[in-house]
């Protein structure tokens, strides 16, 4: 399974193509945060389109801000990306590319990744703390991402 993955942060957008769990390609591009949320989505579309010739089964987005992971919309992110709040990332990308898309908060995604593949592999619970453009944290308790 091939997944186009993007990590949208306040200063950089990291993108890559993951093929059966192996990162095959990787790019890093400055985030146009000062230009606003629509510019960030436009950059995401451009990066995704660049990977499409390789083939893809889906899109995975981790992003700064408070995210409604069910709808894939940004509930709040004004502190890091102006005008990002309210953007429905999942719907915009699914409409543009006709690929299933998942959107999650960046620290939640990092915690799940660490639990499955990284420092927390084999642990029942873990706390993941991130320091970057902003500060955040996420917890995996009894093997499940704790939200709410």
Language-model regions: role of each:
Residues 39-52:
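Short, well-ordered amphipathic alpha-helical segments that serve as non-catalytic structural scaffolds
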Residues 55-56, 148:
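A short alpha-helix-loop-beta-strand transition element characteristic
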Residues 11, 64-67, 132-134:
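Short glycine-rich anion-binding loops that position phosphate/pyrophosphate groups of nucleotides
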Residues 3-7, 56-60, 126-130, 138:
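Short glycine-aspartate micro-motif
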Residues 121-148:
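Glycine-rich phosphate-binding loop of actin/hexokinase-like ATP-binding domains
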